[in-house]
Amino acid sequence: VYAGMVEAMDQAVGTVMDTLTELGLDDKTVVIFTSDNGGLSTSEGSPTSNLPLRAGKGWLYEGGIREPLIVRIPEGWQSTDGSVKRQPVSDAVVTSVDFFPTILSLVGIEGMPAQHVDGMNFVGPLLGHQDYQRGPVYWHYPHYGNQGGQPGAAVRDGAWKLIEWYDSGKTELFRLDVDPGEQFDVASQHAAKRDELLEKLHQWQQDIGALMPSVNGESKLNQLRW
């Protein structure tokens, strides 16, 4: 079933691209292909694998939050930041809130001064610029997932990534440039970096008014019989 769904998705994308060509719109259209989470690999039949990344959908490890991203832009496309070149691969960090300011730039529309924009324009990497700096990226996952994921939050800043697990209060720190599979927690060896990222994470949660989970002392869940 899973393989059939992947095949159907591939066919659907092909149908969209073929239709754009038939309508003469392929050289006037930007196509963005991505996903809302990593591949399903830890539950519900474990139909696939995200190796070398750890875990999958429903988890704060890279297997759960690192998704494919393909941006198809006609060569020579003029954005407000310059002419877009073909850029086969970029290792720039991008998150979904970055799409809005990026699309505005690609279609030549300036953002309204009163608009609040959480994301960052990533046309730079599409232009081949190597000096693009995204800054910290955050995730807030205050609930359990049916794939086995636990409540927590994460922040990535450059090569460093910190995860805070709400149930246990434990924090994990990883260097993704040398450990993309998140096998080696280096929080104890780099306590200053751990504390720095944890402070940034908590400040971000406060700034956005993140809803935090709390223990339900009256829960009867442990008495349920399935």
Question: What is each of the regions a protein language model found here?
Answer:
Residues 1-4, 8-15, 24, 48, ...:
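Extracytoplasmic/secreted proteins, especially bacterial periplasmic and envelope-associated proteins
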Residues 133-135, 201-217:
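Bilobed periplasmic-binding protein-like "clamshell/Venus-flytrap" ligand-binding domains
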Residues 25-31, 66-67, 133-134, 158-160, ...:
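Loop/turn elements at helix/coil->beta-strand transitions in domains of secreted/extracellular proteins
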